Amino acid sequence: MSAGGDFGNPLRKFKLVFLGEQSVAKTSLITRFRYDSFDNTYQAIIGIDFLSKTMYLEDGTIGLRLWDTAGQERLRSLIPRYIRDSAAAVVVYDITNVNSFQQTTKWIDDVRTERGSDVIITLVGNRTDLADKRQVSVEEGERKAKGLNVTFIETRAKAGYNVKQLFRRVAAALPGMESTQDGSREDMSDIKLEKPQEQTVSEGGCSCYSPMSSSTLPQKPPYSFIDCSVNIGLNLFPSLITFCNSSLLPVSWR
């Protein structure tokens, strides 16, 4: 049996790299998706971290390797090697910080320089809970995404708003997963981002520019695969073997 629990079918693994300036809450997005939690005391990473998580789609199960990169200028030289073999890039900015939005152009250019023009890229405006401090409008984000031919979504990691939808959208665009776009298990009708409800977390969908339709997941999948998490500092080896819990199931990370 494969790691994903599908008889005879090996678990397909995809590398997603998160990019953006320091303090745009890239780590918070990953933590919200991986653990469904938010840590107000979380410190900025130094170097590169990664977590793994399985996703249960209509077409099967996939493994996501979520690479969290540091946004500090002095650590930029570490990042290109992790972009090169990625299946997708998530470029994050803070809607309350216009400079972080402006810098996303450079991040997207870096991705295409290292990975090529066919890489999947999603532009994410985070921290919509701070609407009173907003410096970048939804329309500006949509225009930039359209001009750069990338997908766009706004999120709120603190409350979980649109975080699942972000990963569903990325998963639907991954190689071999295109058919999952037509096999949704949930209603993915659009949400207007201009007036998010502070007291609720929408699971219905997202309002975004995108050349593709969305993919969905069951809200409570049978997570039989043991997810692995590894924290990595500056001295990161190019290849690791991670063993999952007591099953000693090898998962190769590159």
Swiss-Prot record:
Expression by tissue: Highest levels are found in fetal and adult brain, prostate, testis and spinal cord. Undetectable expression in adrenal gland, skeletal muscle, bone marrow, fetal, and adult liver, heart, salivary gland, and trachea. Detected in the HEK293, HEK293T, LNCaP, MCF-7, T-47D and EVSA-T cell lines (at protein level).
Q: Name one GO molecular function term.
A: GTPase activity
EC code: 3.6.5.2
Organism phylogeny: Eukaryota, Metazoa, Chordata, Craniata, Vertebrata
Keywords of the record? Cytoplasm, Cytoskeleton, GTP-binding, Hydrolase, Magnesium, Metal-binding, Nucleotide-binding, Nucleus, Phosphoprotein
Cofactor needs: Mg(2+)
| Annotated PANTHER family | RAS-RELATED PROTEIN RAB
State what protein this is by name: Ras-related protein Rab-6C
Mind telling me which Pfam families this protein's record contains?
Ras (PF00071)
Q: What Gene Ontology terms describe where this protein resides (cellular component)? A: centrosome; ciliary basal body; cytosol; endomembrane system; Golgi apparatus; nucleoplasm
> Where is it mainly found?
nucleus
Transmembrane segments in this chain: where?
Answer: none
Cysteines joined through disulfide linkages:
none
- Could you say which protein family the record assigns here? Belongs to the small GTPase superfamily. Rab family.
Residues modified as O-AMP-tyrosine are: Y82
Q: What would be the name of the gene that encodes this protein?
A: RAB6C
Q: Tell me the compartments it is located in.
A: Nucleus; Cytoplasm; Cytoplasm, Cytoskeleton, Microtubule organizing center, Centrosome
Give a short account of what the protein does: The small GTPases Rab are key regulators of intracellular membrane trafficking, from the formation of transport vesicles to their fusion with membranes. Rabs cycle between an inactive GDP-bound form and an active GTP-bound form that is able to recruit to membranes different sets of downstream effectors directly responsible for vesicle formation, movement, tethering and fusion. RAB6C may be involved in the regulation of centrosome duplication and cell cycle progression.
Q: Where is this motif: Switch 1?
A: 32-50
> Where do the annotations place GTP binding?
23-28, 39-40, 42, 71, 126-127, 129, 157-158
Entry note about domains: Switch 1, switch 2 and the interswitch regions are characteristic of Rab GTPases and mediate the interactions with Rab downstream effectors. The switch regions undergo conformational changes upon nucleotide binding which drives interaction with specific sets of effector proteins, with most effectors only binding to GTP-bound Rab.
**Quick one: a GO biological-process term for this protein?**
protein localization to Golgi membrane
Q: Which domain of life is it from?
A: Eukaryota
